[in-house]
């Protein structure tokens, strides 16, 4: 499934990791992750090794894990209130949930992922990173955890176009909370295409397109949607996460 931020989340059974030198953006890492910068470096290494070996991260992504993945995801913290509960829907290899947890120790985060091999990686990663008191992992699709879990913020990256994502994510958001989705240049087009879905669901607030992180072109574009305080209505139901055919970068292999 083509996704707005253009980020490949998986690749078929990679066997070679590029040996290109990796430039660490030391100042940005220190600023964003603070005294957890060493844990962020450990997570980056997990993605570059086990993440690639298990097909969760494409080998060509390794040289840009810091900028395009860890920092890119951690910047979401700029639009999330202090002490919020967060569900990271379709977490994959932990993006954006794990970088967000590392950058924001005040958040309580639940990673929701339907596929077993990704779920296993996530459990191993949060243990390795010492995040078990802050981050939990649930295996399932959005409709599997609906009614069991909810949060003040639901995050998503490279999961689905907004037209589909609204129906999966907004029912997991508590009244007054937000959906925060990482999107790229397609954000405005996706918002326009999904307008009728929001109307069907009874959401009246207009989605916001926000830029977080540096203003030098390396920041992150996000779409933030307020859940509101009224009841949600069912929109035309899309197929659940995991049932939709994913693009080659996000296969459904176990």
From Swiss-Prot:
Cross-referenced Gene3D superfamilies: Vaccinia Virus protein VP39
Binding site for S-adenosyl-L-methionine: 90, 95, 142-143, 157
GO molecular function, one term: rRNA (guanine-N7-)-methyltransferase activity
Superkingdom assignment: Bacteria
GO cellular component, one term: cytosol
Major subcellular site: cytoplasm
The protein's enzyme class: transferase
The keyword rRNA processing is assigned to this record: yes
Family per similarity comment: Belongs to the methyltransferase superfamily. RNA methyltransferase RsmG family.
Name of the protein described by the UniProt record: Ribosomal RNA small subunit methyltransferase G
Organism (species): Kineococcus radiotolerans (strain ATCC BAA-149 / DSM 14245 / SRS30216)
Lineage of the species this protein comes from: Bacteria, Bacillati, Actinomycetota, Actinomycetes, Kineosporiales
